[in-house]
């Protein structure tokens, strides 16, 4: 009996080790994102989020986003920032526009850790739309496109598609988006 038990334990150990080895961290901007790191520690490694990281630094939000949270961050890519009118990003990064930049960035953050599954449940419970209150105090509305892809609508009517959901962090979750969302 002990021999069978030992073989069973060995097989379970092999199966668990194989399952863990097969799990991969999500890749964002060419780099693996680690759930043991916080939002800022992961974001600085993403080649697709250099503009966002520069903006977070300029707004003085690094300490906040390195904090305990949890936070849900809808993280626009460099391409998303490039869609803004010419000169907008450069203007926002100027010290005299720190308050406006902070307002825009905190509009991309919701308190709590909302996975894509959580958002989809809220969308279903809201008959197709979930209303999210941002850290900035404004509203975002989440809905589904093609039945599965989460789309955000901002207060100005702009839309952003979640392109990479569920990038879990030690202090929350990042959902990569393809457009910058803007508050009123």
Predicted regions and their residues:
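Bacterial N-terminal signal peptides
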Residues: 8-16
């Amino acid at each position: 009996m002990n021999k069978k038990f030992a073989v069973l334990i060995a097989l379970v150990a092999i199966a668990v080790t194989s399952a863990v080895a097969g799990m991969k961290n999500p890749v964002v901007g060419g780099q693996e994102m680690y759930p043991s790191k916080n939002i800022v520690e992961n974001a600085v490694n993403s080649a697709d989020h250099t503009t966002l990281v520069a903006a977070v630094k300029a707004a003085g939000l690094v300490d906040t986003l390195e904090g305990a949270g949890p936070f849900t961050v809808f993280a626009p890519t460099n391409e998303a920032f490039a869609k803004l009118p010419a000169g907008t990003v450069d203007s926002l990064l100027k010290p005299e526009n720190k308050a406006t930049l902070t307002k825009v960035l905190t509009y991309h953050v919701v308190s709590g850790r909302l996975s894509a599954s959580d958002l989809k449940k809220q969308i279903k419970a809201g008959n197709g739309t979930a209303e999210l209150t941002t850290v900035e105090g404004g509203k975002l509305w989440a809905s589904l496109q093609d039945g599965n892809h989460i789309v955000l609508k901002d207060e100005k009517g702009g839309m952003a598609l979640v392109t990479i959901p569920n990038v879990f962090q030690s202090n929350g979750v990042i959902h990569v988006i393809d457009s910058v969302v803007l508050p009123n």
